[in-house]
Curated annotation (Swiss-Prot):
This is Lymphotoxin-beta. Belongs to the tumor necrosis factor family. Changing residue 108 to E: In subunit 1; reduces binding of LTA(1)-LTB(2) to LTBR and abolishes LTBR-mediated NF-kappa-B signaling activation. In subunit 2; reduces binding of LTA(1)-LTB(2) to LTBR and abolishes LTBR-mediated NF-kappa-B signaling activation. The lineage of its organism: Eukaryota, Metazoa, Chordata, Craniata, Vertebrata. Spleen and thymus. Heterotrimer of either two LTB and one LTA subunits or (less prevalent) one LTB and two LTA subunits. Changing residue 109 to R: In subunit 1; reduces binding of LTA(1)-LTB(2) to LTBR and abolishes LTBR-mediated NF-kappa-B signaling activation. In subunit 2; reduces binding of LTA(1)-LTB(2) to LTBR and abolishes LTBR-mediated NF-kappa-B signaling activation. It is found in: Membrane. The gene is LTB. It comes from Homo sapiens. GO terms for cellular component: extracellular space; plasma membrane. Residues 88-243 form the THD domain.
Length: 244
């Protein structure tokens, strides 16, 4: 009985010892398996890499610090630039010509010529390329009523302003009428004024429209009463702008 009891206890002790050894071994194995990938990941996180997997070398310590922290320098954006050519355009302002009536100013106040347009009082406005243009013209007029008496119809005056083109592909023939406007003015007489001219009157003739023009064609203005043109600021002008 005594011998058997000791033997049974010894067997149980040996079994418990084997179990403890097995548990300790398994724990060590799991710890080792977890430690290896964690160590590898930590090393990879500390090594600077570019997008292709190669380590980049820079002489700038600040750049090295940025790369080590995982920052990337973005490329600088170039400012947007409109490289398309400007459309031909012109705006001319009426100016008096000595002994010739109406002339045109190309540089003063709001007047301009752009993108190859040219102008001369002798030949008119020349446009540099074929296209659809919007042409416009406004001519201001002023005058005085004649002395009192007489037929009212005899006091009426018809003011006419026209745009013509000539030259270029159109040829050297007779100029072609493009656009025209007209206004008839009948000054009101002052019954009390029997002698001398009446008060000043003012009016304007304006028009505009789309015209297909070719390179080299010249556009000019023709008016019926150059001695009545109003040259005050903003009263008389003409121009063109390419729209297609």
């Amino acid at each position: 009985m005594g011998a058997l009891g000791l033997e049974g206890r010894g067997g149980r002790l040996q079994g418990r010892g084997s179990l403890l050894l097995a548990v300790a071994g398994a724990t060590s194995l799991v710890t080792l398996l977890l430690a290896v990938p964690i160590t590898v990941l930590a090393v990879l996180a500390l090594v600077p890499q570019d997008q292709g997997g190669l380590v980049t070398e820079t002489a700038d310590p600040g750049a090295q610090a940025q790369q080590g922290l995982g920052f990337q320098k973005l490329p600088e954006e170039e400012p947007e630039t409109d490289l398309s050519p400007g459309l031909p355009a012109a705006h001319l302002i009426g100016a008096p010509l000595k002994g010739q009536g109406l002339g045109w100013e190309t540089t003063k106040e709001q007047a301009f010529l752009t993108s190859g347009t040219q102008f001369s009082d002798a030949e008119g406005l020349a446009l540099p390329q074929d296209g659809l243009y919007y042409l416009y013209c406004l001519v201001g007029y002023r005058g005085r009523a004649p002395p009192g008496g007489g037929d009212p119809q005899g006091r009426s005056v018809t003011l006419r302003s026209s745009l013509y083109r000539a030259g270029g592909a159109y040829g050297p023939g007779t100029p072609e009428l493009l656009l025209e406007g007209a206004e008839t003015v009948t000054p009101v007489l002052d019954p009390a004024r029997r002698q001398g001219y009446g008060p000043l009157w003012y009016t304007s003739v304006g028009f505009g429209g789309l015209v297909q023009l070719r390179r080299g064609e010249r556009v000019y203005v023709n008016i019926s009463h150059p001695d009545m043109v109003d040259f005050a600021r903003g009263k008389t002008f003409f121009g063109a702008v390419m729209v297609g």
